[in-house]
C-alpha cells in the first residue's frame, strides 16, 4: 500500500466541517444554539448599554414615563424570553441533544472502522488518528461549533456597538481606528505565545497520561504488585509534572507581561484619553447628553473587549482544528480492498491457494512465499510451525482480512474476490489467538448477536467446549454477567474458562468452516482431550483448520501443513510426517520429551 501524504485542511475548513457534521446529526439544536448565542448577546448589549443610555437621556430631557416604557418594555420582554428559553433549553433539550451528537459521532466512527481493511491498523499514523478521533472527536465537534457561534456573536455585537458609536459621535472612529489594530495585534501576539506553550506541553502531558493509565488500568496491576517498577514510574510522573511547570513558568512570563501592557494601554486610552474626550464633547460642547456619553463609552469598551476575545478565540479554533483534522483524515480514509463481487456463494466448497505471496504494508520482506495448499470440505487440517512462520498471516488471508500480494485464493472454484466480503466471511467461525469476551451476559457472548439464544444449541456448544460443568454452577445461567465491569456479582472466568466460552461461541455459530488459532493454549489436559474429541466428531461437511504449537492437538488432523519462514516445507498426515523424520518429527519428539 503506497502511503500518501494526507492533505492538510485549514482551520476554517475544519470548522465548517464540524458545523456540517453537527448539523447533519442535530439540525434543530445547531440552529438554536447559534441563535441563542448571537441573539442572547445582542439582548444583553441592549439591556446593559443602550437601555441605560436611553433612560438617562429621557431623565435628562425630562421625558414622560411613557417615553421610557416605550423602550423599556420591549427590552424587558426580550430579556424575559431569553431567560426562559435558556433555562428550558439548557435543562431539558441541550443535555439530550449533546448526548445524541456524542453517540451518533461515535457510531459513525465505529461503522467507518468496521468498513476498513485490517491493513489500515498496521499503519501507526492511521491508528493514532483513529484513537484520537474516538476519544476526542465528539467534544471537539461541539467545541468548534460553540467557538463559531461565539465568534459570530462577537462580530454581530461589535457591528451593532460600532454603529451606535458612529450614530452618536462619528469622530470616535478616529480613536477606534487606532485602538482596534492595537488590540488585534496585541491579542495575536498573546495568542501565538499561548499556542507555543500548549505545543510544548502536549507531548509531556501525553507521557504523564500514559504513566497515570498504568497505575489505574487492571492490565498492569499484577506487574506493578510483583515488580519494582512503581518507583521508576512515580519518578517519571514527577519529572513530567516538573517539566510542564518549567514550560509554563518560562512561557507564561511574556504572556502575562503582554496582557498587562495591553490592558494598561487600552485602559489608559479608553478610560483616560477617550473618556475625557467624551466628557468634553458632552459637557463643554453639548454635542450629546450624559446618557449617550455612557452608551458610547460602554459600547467602546464592549467593542474593544469583543475584538480582544475574538483574537484569543483563534487559539481555540486552532486547538479544535487539530483534532477535527484527525477526524477528517479518519472519516475520509478510503477502503482499498475491493468489494465488488457479485457471485452467489456456494453452500460449501474447497479453499485452494495457488502460489500465494504476502508482504505486510511497510515491510520489504514477504511473510508468505509461494504458498500452495488446499482445504477440502470436511477435512480437519492443521497448520504447525515455529513462531513467525506465517501461520496466523495465512489465516488472515483465508478470511480476506488482507488480499495476497501475489497468487490467488479460490473458494468453490472461484476467486474469493468474486464474492461479497460479508458473504464470504460468513462461512467462517473463528477462534482467534487474541480473542476477546465482552462485558455482557453469557448468552450474548455465545450468540455474538442480538438474536434470542437457542438454548439447545448453546447447551450443546458448552458441552463440546468443556465448559458445561462450570456453567451448571452459575446461579444466573445464561444471564450471568461476564467480568465485574458493570456488575459486582459478575463472573470473572479464568484464562482456560475464557477460552472455553470463546470456543463455545465458534461451535454455536455452526459455520461451514471453523478456524481455531491455538485453541488449547489455556486449556488443562482434560479440556484439551475434550477439544480433540470435539474436533474429530464434527460432522463430515465441516472444514476445520487448527493452528497449534501443541502437536498433541494436531495429530488427529486429516492433513498437516508445516510452515517455516513463510513457506510450506512439509505436508501430510501425522504418521507420514513422522516417517519422513523432518522438522515436524523433530518438533513432535521435542514436545514428547516433556511427558516422559
Model-derived features: where do they sit?
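Membrane-integrated ABC transporters
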Residues: 1-44, 60, 65-70, 90-94, ...
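An intracellular "coupling" helix at the cytosolic face of ABC transporter transmembrane type-1 domains
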Residues: 24, 132-144, 196-203, 213-216, ...
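A hydrophobic transmembrane-helix motif
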Residues: 43-54, 149-191, 246-297
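ABC-fold ATPase nucleotide-binding domain signature/coupling loops
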Residues: 130, 366, 468-501, 510, ...
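Cytosolic ends of transmembrane helices, especially the final helix of ABC transmembrane type-1 domains
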Residues: 229, 293-332
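Helix-to-loop junction immediately C-terminal to a conserved catalytic motif
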Residues: 398-399
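ABC ATPase nucleotide-binding domain helical subdomain, centered on the C-loop/LSGGQ "ABC signature"
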Residues: 408-410, 425, 443-488, 532, ...
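C-terminal portion of ABC ATPase nucleotide-binding domains
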Residues: 477, 533, 550-596
Amino acid at each position: 500500500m503506497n502511503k500518501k501524504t494526507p492533505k492538510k485542511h485549514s482551520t476554517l475548513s475544519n470548522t465548517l466541517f464540524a458545523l456540517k457534521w453537527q448539523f447533519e446529526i442535530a439540525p434543530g439544536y445547531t440552529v438554536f444554539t447559534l441563535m441563542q448565542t448571537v441573539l442572547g448577546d445582542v439582548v444583553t448589549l441592549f439591556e446593559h448599554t443602550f437601555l441605560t443610555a436611553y433612560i438617562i437621556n429621557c431623565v435628562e430631557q425630562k421625558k414622560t414615563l411613557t417615553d421610557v416604557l416605550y423602550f423599556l418594555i420591549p427590552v424587558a420582554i426580550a430579556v424575559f424570553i431569553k431567560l426562559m428559553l435558556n433555562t428550558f433549553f439548557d435543562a431539558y433539550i441541550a443535555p439530550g441533544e449533546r448526548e445524541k451528537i456524542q453517540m451518533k459521532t461515535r457510531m459513525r466512527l465505529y461503522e467507518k472502522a468496521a468498513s476498513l481493511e485490517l491493513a489500515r491498523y498496521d499503519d501507526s499514523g492511521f491508528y493514532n488518528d483513529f484513537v484520537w478521533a474516538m476519544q476526542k472527536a465528539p467534544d471537539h465537534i461541539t467545541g468548534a461549533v460553540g467557538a463559531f457561534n461565539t465568534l459570530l456573536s462577537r462580530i454581530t455585537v461589535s457591528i451593532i456597538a460600532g454603529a451606535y458609536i458612529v450614530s452618536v459621535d462619528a469622530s470616535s472612529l478616529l480613536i477606534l481606528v487606532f485602538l482596534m489594530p492595537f488590540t488585534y495585534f496585541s491579542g495575536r501576539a498573546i495568542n501565538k505565545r499561548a499556542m507555543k506553550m500548549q505545543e510544548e506541553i502536549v507531548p509531556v502531558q501525553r507521557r504523564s497520561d500514559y504513566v497515570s493509565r498504568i497505575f489505574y488500568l487492571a492490565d498492569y496491576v499484577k506487574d506493578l504488585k510483583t515488580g519494582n517498577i512503581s518507583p521508576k514510574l512515580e519518578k517519571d510522573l514527577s519529572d513530567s509534572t516538573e517539566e510542564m511547570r518549567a514550560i509554563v513558568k518560562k512561557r507564561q512570563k511574556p504572556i502575562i507581561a503582554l496582557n498587562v501592557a495591553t490592558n494598561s494601554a487600552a485602559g489608559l486610552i479608553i478610560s483616560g484619553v477617550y473618556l475625557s474626550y467624551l466628557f468634553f464633547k458632552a459637557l463643554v460642547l453639548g454635542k450629546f447628553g450624559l446618557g449617550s456619553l455612557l452608551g458610547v463609552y460602554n459600547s467602546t469598551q464592549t467593542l474593544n473587549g469583543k475584538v480582544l476575545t475574538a483574537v484569543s478565540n483563534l487559539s481555540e479554533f486552532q486547538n479544535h482544528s487539530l483534532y477535527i483534522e484527525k477526524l477528517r483524515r479518519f472519516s475520509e480514509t478510503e477502503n482499498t480492498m475491493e468489494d465488488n463481487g457479485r457471485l452467489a456463494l456456494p453452500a460449501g466448497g474447497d479453499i485452494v491457494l495457488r502460489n500465494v505471496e504476502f508482504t505486510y504494508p511497510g515491510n520489504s520482506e514477504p511473510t508468505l512465499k509461494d504458498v500452495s495448499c488446499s482445504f477440502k470440505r470436511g477435512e480437519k487440517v492443521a497448520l504447525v510451525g515455529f513462531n513467525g512462520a506465517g501461520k496466523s498471516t495465512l489465516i488472515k488471508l483465508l478470511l480476506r482480512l488482507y488480499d495476497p500480494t501475489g497468487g490467488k485464493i479460490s473458494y468453490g472454484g472461484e476467486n474469493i474476490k468474486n464474492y461479497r466480503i460479508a458473504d464470504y466471511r460468513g462461512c467462517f467461525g473463528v477462534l482467534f489467538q487474541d480473542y476477546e469476551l465482552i462485558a455482557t451476559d453469557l448468552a450474548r457472548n455465545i450468540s455474538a448477536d442480538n438474536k434470542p439464544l437457542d438454548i439447545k444449541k448453546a447447551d450443546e456448544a458448552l458441552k463440546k467446549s468443556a465448559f458445561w460443568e462450570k456453567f451448571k454452577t452459575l446461579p444466573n445461567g445464561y444471564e450471568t454477567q461476564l467480568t465485574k465491569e458493570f456488575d459486582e456479582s459478575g463472573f470473572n472466568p479464568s484464562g482456560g474458562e475464557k477460552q472455553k466460552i470463546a470456543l463455545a461461541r465458534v461451535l454455536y455459530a455452526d459455520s461451514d468452516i471453523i478456524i481455531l488459532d491455538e485453541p488449547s493454549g489455556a486449556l488443562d489436559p482434560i479440556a484439551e482431550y475434550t477439544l480433540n474429541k470435539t474436533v474429530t466428531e464434527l460432522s463430515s461437511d465441516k472444514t476445520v483448520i487448527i493452528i497449534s504449537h501443541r502437536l498433541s492437538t494436531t495429530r488427529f488432523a486429516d492433513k498437516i501443513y508445516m510452515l517455516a519462514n513463510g513457506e510450506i516445507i512439509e505436508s501430510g498426515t501425522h504418521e507420514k510426517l513422522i516417517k519422513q523424520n523432518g522438522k515436524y518429527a523433530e518438533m513432535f519428539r521435542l514436545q514428547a520429551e516433556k511427558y516422559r
